[in-house]
UniProtKB/Swiss-Prot annotation:
Keyword 4Fe-4S assigned: no
GO annotation terms (biological process): vesicle-mediated transport
Superkingdom in the source lineage: Eukaryota
Protein name stated in the entry: Increased recombination centers protein 6
Swiss-Prot/TrEMBL keywords: Chromosomal rearrangement
Native species: Zygosaccharomyces rouxii (strain ATCC 2623 / CBS 732 / NBRC 1130 / NCYC 568 / NRRL Y-229)
GO-annotated molecular function: protein-macromolecule adaptor activity
Lineage: Eukaryota, Fungi, Dikarya, Ascomycota, Saccharomycotina
Family: Belongs to the IRC6 family.
Cysteines joined through disulfide linkages: none
Gene3D superfamilies with a match to the protein in the record: 3.40.50.11960
Summary of the function given for this chain in its UniProt record: Involved in gross chromosomal rearrangements (GCRs) and telomere healing.
Amino acid sequence: MIMDSVSSPEQPKNKILVTFGDGDSIHQRELISQLFGIDIGIGDRIVKGLVWKTKYYRVEFDLYIDDYNDFSSWFQEFASEEFAALREAMAGLVVVDQYEPTKPLNPLGLQDTFVVWVNTDSKVGQDQVDEINDKLFQTEESTVELVNLHSNEDTNEYGEKIGIPRFKEIVDTCSWKNCDMDYLTSTSSTTNPEVSLELIVQRMQHARLKHANSEMDNDEALQIAQEIAEELTGKED
């Protein structure tokens, strides 16, 4: 497990840890390029001063790269007290491997940290991924999401982003707690634009789950849309 020095409890949560089930460094470089749009050197384990940029903001982050032979052993080490300081400094944890239901997806109670499992098994279809995520979303404490690396489409049947576009959307809406963010677009609203996007995504997911087992007519769909609009504008009945 890689380590690096960390500072005080008020330190920025600007570290993203990516761990691979495949130890092939060339393959790791290719996937890092797909996920983050950057090129790293062979053998790089800690890359500092990277920039994540959206149309709303830019922020610097550090990328940590690791791999494992046995995920359970790696996860046990990651969950130990020895790596508590690293966990507190993390903006995100990304596992890149074939998804297996027996592997733990417990986010360890990480606060203000996204946890993504990037499934590399092409035999796992998007319908199965959506089903797994539906179950995860029903657990309020869960911050884990499964993303399919080999998705042939950019969106699912609900119009939600999937695959690599969904991964990038998750990073876009990261809270980046205590980070020095450079906002690129002025707005008359006191709500940050990326926070609004996160609220939209979460509200739509919750609405879909709420009505997953029932047929929605036009009136019900309109009501959901109105609720989302009122929530984002702060309008009350």
